Design a protein with these regions (language model features):
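Positively charged n-region of N-terminal signal peptides that target proteins for export
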Residues: 1-4
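Bacterial N-terminal signal peptides
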Residues: 6-16
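A short, N-terminal "cap"/entry segment at the start of jelly-roll beta-barrel domains
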Residues: 20-46, 50-56, 76-78, 82-160, ...
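His-enriched metal-coordination microenvironments in redox/metal-binding proteins
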Residues: 58-62, 102, 106, 172-176
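Glycine- and acidic-residue-biased ligand/ion/polar-headgroup-sensing regions
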Residues: 61-79, 174-194
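Active-site scaffold segments
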Residues: 65-68, 93, 179-182, 207-210, ...
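Short, well-ordered beta-strand segments in beta-rich or mixed alpha/beta enzyme
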Residues: 68-69, 104, 116, 163, ...
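Short, charged beta-turn/beta-strand-edge "cap" motif at the junction between a beta-strand
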Residues: 100-101, 214-216
Length: 234
């Protein structure tokens, strides 16, 4: 009788714990994650969570970079760990390794928005580390702006570029492709060596995939300060 009672109690506890644990979904099935772009290098989601709302418990199976759009105050509930409260600034960019599931709770009165960039070649980079970049961290003072190389992970290098009206990023070469994330509205002019000038116009929160193999200068042709994040690949 005692054995049966003990088994019943254990079963009830297991059922209670199961009921208290949110069911886990893939990131592609999480309603706040909207697929914006996908290729062999990246899978990019535009993320939006309403004020005082939360995502579903979802799993990150790839290392990823996220770019915050607008100031944010969120609670990060990682499965199996205590909740952590985080304050983020507009354009703040971070790298996180994969292998966890979490819920993101928006604690503010404004929508929480970010761009989540999954690095699709992370496992390959773990097995065989890619060549080092010529520079993996550093701040460059430009003519009317700054270029801040933030970090290099999994064969990808992230940088923040800020240009005042008329500010210029000097001539540089893109051997591989790169992703552009517009933190502000962008009205840029790209002067490509051997091809001439072209416009780059994006709204805040837009993303653009650029193929490599070209050399150019980049100028803020607009009347407002321009801020963007680039994630480039070798």
């Amino acid at each position: 009788m005692r054995r049966c009672l003990a088994l019943l109690i254990v079963s009830l506890l297991a059922l209670t714990l199961t009921a208290q644990t949110p069911s886990e979904v893939e990131i592609t099935a999480e309603p706040g994650h909207h697929l914006a772009l996908e290729n062999q290098y990246v899978r990019v989601f535009k993320v939006e969570v309403a004020p005082h709302a939360a995502t579903l418990m979802h799993r990150h199976r790839h290392d990823y970079i996220y770019v915050t759009l607008g100031a944010a105050h969120v609670e990060n509930d990682v499965a199996g760990k205590p909740p952590v409260t985080i304050s983020l600034q507009d354009g703040e960019t971070h790298f996180l390794p994969s292998g966890f599931a979490h819920i993101a709770k928006n604690l503010s009165d404004q929508p929480f928005r970010n761009i989540t960039i999954e690095l699709m070649q992370d496992e390959k980079a773990h097995r065989s580390p890619p060549p080092k970049w010529d520079e993996e961290r550093g701040l460059h003072i430009l003519n009317g702006g700054t270029e801040d190389i933030l970090f290099a992970k999994d064969g990808a290098r992230a940088a923040e570029l800020q240009l005042q009206p008329g500010g210029v990023l000097p001539k540089h070469h893109h051997a591989g492709p790169h992703l552009v994330v517009a933190v502000t509205d962008l009205d840029l002019r790209s002067d490509i060596e051997g091809k001439g000038a072209s416009k780059v116009q994006l709204k805040a929160g837009d993303v653009s995939w650029e193929k490599g193999g070209f050399t150019h200068t980049l100028t803020n042709a607009g009347k407002q300060n321009a801020k963007l994040i680039t994630v480039e690949f070798q």
